[in-house]
């Protein structure tokens, strides 16, 4: 069955859990009126990864103009807003504080309800955006694979707001593993899109192992990363030297092998869990869900309807926070002014 929510609402959603300053206006949990993202990718690329202090300071610089852009693009003003939603965790403490304190201040001054949202639940509700309704189309239960730079969680969604954590990574998150693999291959940061691009045209001359962790729904990517590292060391281009980088063919084939291994493990374990729990659909969320190989493999083997957000909605955005908040309000969700941040918040 679908989600019955009779109240018309426009929600202003904030997402600042990591390195994206994102603000969106969302109507009725499904229709995006504006979705503005101020990315810090280029800023952090020079350091080879996200620097928390730099991220939080950049949020302070970007948050006000991002809010202004969201209202301008939507053609709305404050009188049109019915509630304010914000990511309260998990994430980087300094980054979360910027979003939460701005959202609190605006909600208090405008006499609007404040709704704190779990970032991971936001990634799930990205699947309700763009006019879709997986609940109405397929029904519950569903399997959700949330895969990003900070998380790789396999979750059974029994209904709205009711989740069971089936498995998670035991070491690196998938996105973190992509970043480390890209560093080994000399590709830079962020690793996911760079590995995907470098893999184009590969013919499959390289093979890396798969870590299945049989008997569990957990994931492990450190072994795949180590296998790639050992290949790089054996061929003499890691640790990197000024005049001893890998040739383009080696980079292409190794990048493809790494991407294939990580994607296959996530896809197969997700499908196995879907069959075990007799779910009615599979949903993806998180930045790694934008990976074309993962989308392709899951699309080929999923035994049930598969929902994957558009790539722009897989990465961190305010629209998914607004969507999650809308459906929470159906259960009376509303936070007090002393709402805190929760850097280690879990979904279940």
Residue map of PLM features:
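N-terminal beta-alpha supersecondary unit
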Residues: 9-80, 86-90, 119, 123
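Conserved phosphate-binding/catalytic loops in two-lobed NTP-binding clefts
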Residues: 116-117, 298-321
């Amino acid at each position: 069955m679908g989600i019955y929510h009779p109240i018309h609402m426009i929600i202003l959603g904030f997402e600042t859990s990591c390195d994206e300053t994102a603000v969106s206006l969302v109507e009725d949990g499904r229709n995006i009126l504006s979705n503005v993202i101020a990315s810090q990718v280029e800023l952090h690329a020079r350091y080879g990864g996200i620097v928390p202090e730099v991220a939080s300071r950049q949020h302070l610089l970007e948050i006000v103009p991002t809010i202004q852009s969201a209202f301008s693009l939507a053609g709305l003003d404050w009188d049109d807003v019915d509630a304010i939603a914000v990511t309260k965790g998990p994430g980087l403490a300094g980054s979360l504080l910027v979003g939460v304190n701005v959202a609190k201040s605006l909600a208090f001054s405008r006499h609007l309800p404040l709704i704190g949202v779990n970032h991971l639940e936001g990634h799930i509700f990205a699947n309700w955006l763009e006019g879709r309704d997986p609940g109405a189309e397929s029904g519950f239960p569903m399997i959700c694979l949330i895969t990003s730079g900070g998380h790789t969680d396999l979750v059974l969604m029994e209904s709205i707001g009711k989740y069971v954590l089936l498995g998670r990574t035991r070491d690196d998150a998938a996105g973190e593993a992509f970043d480390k693999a890209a560093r080994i291959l000399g590709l830079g940061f962020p690793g996911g899109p760079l590995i995907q691009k470098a893999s184009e045209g590969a013919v499959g001359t390289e093979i890396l192992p798969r870590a299945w962790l049989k008997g569990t729904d957990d994931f492990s990517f450190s072994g795949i990363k180590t296998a790639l590292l050992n290949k790089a060391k054996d061929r003499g281009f890691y640790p990197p030297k000024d005049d001893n980088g890998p040739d383009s063919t080696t980079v292409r084939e190794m990048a493809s092998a790494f991407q294939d291994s990580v994607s296959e493990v996530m896809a197969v374990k997700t499908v196995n869990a879907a069959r075990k729990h007799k779910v009615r659909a599979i949903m993806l969320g998180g930045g790694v869900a934008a990976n074309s190989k993962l989308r392709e493999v899951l699309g080929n083997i999923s035994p049930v309807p598969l929902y994957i957000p558009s790539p722009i909605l897989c990465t961190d955005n305010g629209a998914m926070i607004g969507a999650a908040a809308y459906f929470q309000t159906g259960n009376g969700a509303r936070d007090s002014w002393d709402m805190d941040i929760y850097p280690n918040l879990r979904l279940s």
